[in-house]
Amino acid sequence: PILDGGPCTIGIESTIVDLTQEQPAILRPGFIGQHDIESIVGPLGTSNTVAPGTLRSHYSPMTSLLLSHEPELERQKLETEGRSVAVLRAQETPQYARNLYAELRKMDEMGVDILIVEPAPNEGIGPAINDRLQRAAAKFSTD
């Protein structure tokens, strides 16, 4: 059985920080950002440790997902090619984080050929949102 706790207040998973080394490192970005962590522990280092939710392809919908800073231009181009498209525009970052997975699931259920998603601004919780979006798009990426 699956329990439905209703909508969540934050949306994306927590920040994971490695405190086992001399210099702490973020293993997975989340709601608590780098600036907030550095204000407590000082400058952060890097780590090669694998944490939950950090595989290259993760959080992926079934439908191809394209990240674009120009989603309307991409939509027009793809629709001209005869492709059916759904677009998710960036929102205020707390709202975007809170609704991200629900929006991706809803768009996935639409049965379109491609989901075009606009990345979040790269500030506050934006890097964590973009981390999840890059992972969601990774299995469809050619790089």
PLM ranges: what are they?
Residues 1-143:
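Active-site-adjacent structural elements in enzyme catalytic cores
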